Amino acid sequence: MSTITSTNETNFVIDNDEVKGRQIISKRIYQCGELIFQEQPLVLAQFEWNKLYKYYACEYCLYPLESCEQNVRRLCQDSSIIIPHSECDPNRNIDQQIVRCPKCNEMYCSIICYQQAMNNYHLTLCQSNENQNKDQLIRHIIDLWRNVHPPPETTSISLVLKIMAMLKQSNNRLLLLQELQKFSQGVQSENQQFYHKLLRKEFESQVEQLRYALEQFNEQYMQIVEFKWFLTSNGFRQLLALLGRNQQGIGTSSLAIWVKNCEALSIPQQAVAAAVVTSDISQFIDAIYTKIDDISGEFIDCEGSGLFKLQSCCKFY
């Protein structure tokens, strides 16, 4: 049995199926490449190893916080590289645009993102040294996560921390909990069981350490009664399964933005741009990607994951 939920969109509806969970059902035929919808995530977080290795990105929206040249030089470990056609890089003056939290130095791409983060969760999670025990526990939780989830990464424990902080700061916890509850529909389906790799038996002790640390964080600093069940042994496993099943990957790159803008240039402009460094800009781009692959491998982008209310409905069975 399923129920249909109407949306503000005219081209699709949300079907709540008892077995498959939420699904988007189209009301018309779409053409290949056509945009169906756009949405902001309920919450997102950069991967912990990705952040540790200085893939600089906005803490709130994951927009890259390097110029293309800075990005390429870091990935290639070559400070002599000069990127042609700098006007194709919207991040060429990004150093002057970065907004930092005055207390913890966390970076944001704009004052808007900083204010949104503060309003939603950062007021709670800001590691300002005003409460060193709390800051130390947050770092301990993140370190535990890195120990059990090396690259290539698939999710981040910061998603859980942010959800807890959002509940702490929310004026309407019930509404936020209802939104989170929607993501859990179908997680325990007998016909479509999802197993997050952290739920494998060899990770049991590490998962328990994480759960206990988060439980202590809630008891000592959050005091979110409504979240206590998610920090029980069974509840925490369900929470990880919920994230693993519903999250969407997010990747951003100042190099990719520059390449896309270069491809949009007219042929004469491309020739001028390429002449700065090489006779053919496409060859220059290919050479850059080859060098990045040799030095940094597949780890090119600022990467993270997020929970999107609509995109999480787009599953393939």
Enumerate the language-model features and the residues they cover.
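Short alpha-helical interaction motifs and adjacent low-complexity tails used for partner binding
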Residues: M1-Y317
